[in-house]
Amino acid sequence: MSKQLLALNIDGALLRSNGKIHQATKDAIEYVKKKGIYVTLVTNRHFRSAQKIAKSLKLDAKLITHSGAYIAEKIDAPFFEKRISDDHTFNIVQVLESYQCNIRLLHEKYSIGNKKKVNSNLLGKALIHPSDPIFYPVQFVESLSDLLMDEPVSAPVIEVYTEHDIQHDITETITKAFPAVDVIRVNDEKLNIVPKGVSKEAGLALVASELGLSMDDVVAIGHQYDDLPMIELAGLGVAMGNAVPEIKRKADWVTRSNDEQGVAYMMKEYFRMQQRKGFLDKFHMKRV
């Protein structure tokens, strides 16, 4: 069965370890676009960051950003958005400030984080986002809750950078205290707190539906824990060679790693036999 929508994770899939996209990957994306495949990005990143990458790939698509909480082609005209209320954002931050963690409120137009002292590796991941565009303000403050008292924020996503051994405690505490949100494990050092029902897979299903497609028509490529549900739901779920073992076990296809152009390899191998939809319709042929 042919696929008509290709959903790509950014970090660990599109991007190599050096943070760059290989020319082979760009060429492969252009190749599948010429076959009539709708290509989009599915990411935890904020919209501005995903938009910058989409532009470099010449993608005109609804981008699934903020873990599925913000879907748009243009920042001021979202197709879908869902936020944590400013009251809940404030209260959740108060709870998180009792833990040894870095907090980042990821709005589509700016981000605000705290300066909590954690190990240098975690701090670097919370502070350094090399793809943040210059027009995306990033602010760090001593007390996030103090700032929110004066300047309320309704955040699509609250990022939490912390040690793996306290992730479960944070997840349990937030889930019990705030039923209006979900806590998603991204990797061993990061949790995302999102509005209830928000996820990458839910966002991808929305975009597919808007295109008149089902999840059976989708190829989804990812590598970390929060990619697993969309990989399982997609018609073809693909794990990167650098993916966590659980995703590799459950994927339909394991491609090469991000440093071995795994995305480009998979696209060329899978889509090379698939004809453009309009070509097949012209001759009343079934796609294979």
UniProtKB/Swiss-Prot annotation:
Disulfide bonds: none annotated. GO terms for cellular component: cytosol. InterPro entries: Cof, HAD-like_sf, HAD-SF_hydro_IIB, HAD_sf. CDD domains: HAD_Pase (cd07516). It comes from the Bacteria. SUPFAM superfamilies: HAD-like. Coiled coil: none annotated. Keywords: Stress response. Induction: By phosphate starvation, via the PhoP/PhoR two-component regulatory system. This is Stress response protein YhaX.
